[in-house]
Amino acid sequence: MLRLILFCLSIIPLCAKGQAQTVVFKALPEGINTLGDEELGRWNMDGKSMVYTSLTKEKVGLNIARFDDAGRMISVEAFPFDAIYNGGGHTLSPDGKNLVFTLCGRKGGFGDCDLYMAEFKEGRWTAPINMGVEVNSASWESQPVFGLDGQTLFFASTRPGGLGGSDIWVTRRSLTGHWSTPANAGAGINTVNNEGSPYIHFDGRTLYFMRDGKTGMGGYDLYISQLGIDDQWRTAENMGNGINSAADEGGLAIHPDGKTAVITRFTTDRQNDLFQFQLPEKFRAAPLQALNVVVKDKQTLKPVRARLEIYQVEAFDTTRLSQWADDQGKIATPLLKNKSYGVIAEAEGYLAYSANLPGDNAAVRSLEIKMIPLASAKGQVIVMQNVFFETGSAALLPGSIPELKKLVLTLKSNPNMKIEITGHTDNVGTDDTNMTLSRSEERRVGKEC
């Protein structure tokens, strides 16, 4: 029964139809792989740790493996979680503060297997709580994975209303903490067959999952789908021979580098072990970096629980992400490498804050935000970091819209506030030309506000 949390792999010779890709599978080291079964390995956002499900005769549990900068294993230990929770099929939110996993046959549950959530607070994990009838049903729910924002959850379920036996569903958490009624992921993902084991890369737009049926290589195969700009999933593509075989494949997850994958495979001694391999170029996701933010009061330096909006300057309309800082004023979130981002922080009683993060190739970035209380805002100079104009013109670029909208909201919320808008150009062109352009840009911003 416990193995139904995940999936069962079997030994069948490699499928011979189609041209095989050159894929080399490398077993993860001893200490991770054991005489028991290891499944569903998933890297954390920094790429230096992996949480996976361990199955023994006695129990199902979670372990965490840690790696150095070169990818060598340093240690393996039980996940810091009460051992009485005999569960697996897990996902951690990108900031590492929310854990959703599967428990089966629990008193007070809604179906055979339900999804439960625990939170990391004050240095420890809270007791898991059933995610409720909003998410769980009288059917089977399992194999969850958090989306990019930590507020979206994909999972597999056999609930009524799907397109086949097991489908992939999506639920979203509101600002009040309530999860929405799950929506079917749609016909681009789900079919009359069984879909499961979803994994959405940290880029938020690349979904990997498994599906059975006669059109694949055999058993369960791995598929990939991309999210279009219309927020619809494109028709999923079989990842092909070399990755898929006549046996079952599932449990794939991607390293933040976008090119390294981990998968569960059935070994010759009939055990499930974890293997990694390099994804073929066409299946790779964009490489990522971790952004660690801390928000403080500029005067007291105490943490501020601000709401942050983070967006790609070049594609603000499709990449916007909103998150709340925790009680320590901290947020951790993934960004695409080599992309420029705008950051806007808002908190009650404070002036809105903006920052611009030029693209770079670092694995980890840090940002400290010091917010100015409204009570002491008079005379303060606020630099709007994400207002952009076309070269030699007062025409605003689209990436300026989020910041200007926030300024408008601040003014509407504080009707007695008066501001002076001052613009500065670069040093290209004559002084007279630049002065004229600065005045034009000031008027343009004033008109938008």
Q: Which stretches of residues belong to each language-model region?
A:
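Periplasmic OmpA/Pal-like peptidoglycan-binding modules at the C-termini of bacterial envelope proteins
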Residues: R265, D273-F275, A395, N414-M417, ...
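Short, conserved micro-motifs composed of acidic
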Residues: Q21-V294, L321, K339, A363-V364, ...
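Bacterial Sec-dependent N-terminal signal peptides
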Residues: M1-T22
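Periplasmic OmpA-like peptidoglycan-binding domain that tethers envelope proteins to the cell wall
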Residues: R211, G216, N414, T422-C449
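Solvent-exposed, polar/charged alpha-helical surfaces in well-ordered, non-transmembrane soluble domains
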Residues: M45, P94-K97, I129, L148-Q151, ...
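Periplasmic peptidoglycan-binding/tethering modules of Gram-negative envelope proteins
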Residues: F283-I310, E314-K418
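Solvent-exposed loop/turn segments at secondary-structure junctions
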Residues: R106-K107, P160-G161, A394, T425-G429
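Short, histidine-centered active-site or binding-site loop motifs used for metal coordination
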Residues: L103, A156, V387-F388, G423-D426
